[in-house]
């Protein structure tokens, strides 16, 4: 799988404002603001770090940068699955840190205009609902938009 890069010029362009990078976990579509995504890489060997929470898989060396790797499935409390050819790592930058998110598969960057975004229902339907900031409606489907602040809290 080739790396997909989001360069600084693209990040600053006005059309990027309502763009979300969509990925899949357990058959459901999730999104993060495309401005947080640096690149997508294939799975790599991950060095385990002792005494870390279960959802933190460890670290990788990416071109000289040490990147912490989080398993999104485990963070959501979902059943782990074997990595396959679709499994990849989405490298994000958040609060001046680079992190990697292991996802089942990547889809694409999609525009979701503000009028198609609404807050999630108040009811906690599952144990990962706390990580959802908004729900985006795209065509006839729903994209669950992550709240990175809550998702990255320990």
Name each model feature, range by range.
Residues 1-154:
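An acidic, low-aromatic, low-complexity terminal/linker signal
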């Amino acid at each position: 799988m080739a790396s997909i890069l989001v360069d600084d010029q693209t990040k600053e362009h006005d059309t990027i404002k309502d763009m979300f990078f969509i990925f899949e976990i357990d058959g459901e579509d999730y999104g993060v603001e495309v401005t947080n995504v640096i690149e997508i890489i294939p799975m790599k060997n991950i060095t385990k770090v002792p005494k870390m929470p279960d959802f933190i898989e460890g670290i990788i060396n990416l071109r000289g940068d040490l990147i912490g790797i989080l398993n999104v499935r485990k963070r959501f409390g979902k059943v782990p699955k074997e990595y396959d050819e679709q499994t990849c790592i989405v490298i994000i930058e958040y609060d001046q840190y680079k992190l990697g998110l292991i996802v089942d598969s990547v889809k694409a960057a999609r525009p979701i205009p503000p009028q198609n975004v609404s807050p999630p229902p108040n009811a906690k339907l599952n144990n990962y609902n706390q990580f959802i900031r908004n729900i985006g409606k795209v065509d006839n489907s729903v994209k669950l938009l992550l709240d990175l602040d809550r998702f990255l809290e320990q």
